[in-house]
Amino acid sequence: MHQAISMHDGSSRFRGFRSIAIANSTHGKYPTGADSWIQHTRDIIFSLTGEKVVLLTSTGSLNWELQCYLAARAGVAQIIILPATRTHFHHRMIECADQLGVDPDLTEFLPLEAARENLRNYGEKRDRFILEMADRIIPVSVRPNGRLESLLRVIQPHGKIDASMQIHWAGSPGLPVKLPDAEAVRNIVDPILEGWLIHWTRASQGPWPGEKKCDFFRDLLESRSEYPRSAQKTFQRILSEKKIRASSWRIRNNQPVVAFSALPPSQALRLMRWRPRYVRFSFEPFGIAVEPETASASGIREVIYLESPDPPPEEIPAYLFQGRGKKGDWPIEQEYRHPGDFDLTGLSRNEVQPADLMEMITKTNKAVD
């Protein structure tokens, strides 16, 4: 497959094809298959099957990468615009093809100069480049007074915009999270998990760690009103895989770790809050609890909170250090970390157990009744 991947140049196999760009604004971090812009984009791309057209697509945002995936599924030719780099561009093409599951016989890659530009500036340059290159532009869901609408307004006099399939723009709804009653957690769950370390999950913005984008898009299109990578589905994936996947987000030296908290569930509940800066919850009421001795034997260690920016001692792994933050709120999480993925295989219910707070409360109340 990698041998067949090619760059778009003067000898393009799509010479004579009519180029099409489908224009969508950003809609939010947690889309579902029921979102109108996704359904309309899918229908338009599948309507192009068998036509002598080539779709202009790109990467770097969900609305562009979804089109790459849909074009591959519909058997529609595409030219994927990627940031140009002095080195490793061929590797980037291979990775993109693998992640999005594109058909190498129907795909070419076109580099777009991106040197010395930040991500936002490149995104504007990419969108303008695609719209100017296209023979036909199909707006689907464009945010009023947004950057994309401004670009379309400039291009409109050229007469290549087909607005016949455009729908009203509506941002994706927020992520619904139902938290259990704090008193019930304190009275029912805290005694069960006293002293245990808990890894709390949250919704994933896009693919799970270790998951290909094409698998995420497959599930997104099949989903209805529920986001396919919600905290609950992440929790279910951990149980089915018997593995907690590590993340390097905000960890020294980008060391992938699995984080745990020593807080009783009722206290952890107070920290489950929406974080506007990251457009997500800190964590949600679905966790994996590990018995203390098992945690220690498995290599889970307590995080050391630093008062100063000075480098930590070399004899202690860097991933165990964490700055206190400007408000000094990191220590209240009582965090522990495990280097790399945490394997649940072979651990008994006495050593590790799921901590779905709502389910634990419901089961206990039913047993009492």
What are these regions (language model features)?
Residues 165-369:
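NAD-dependent ADP-ribosyltransferases
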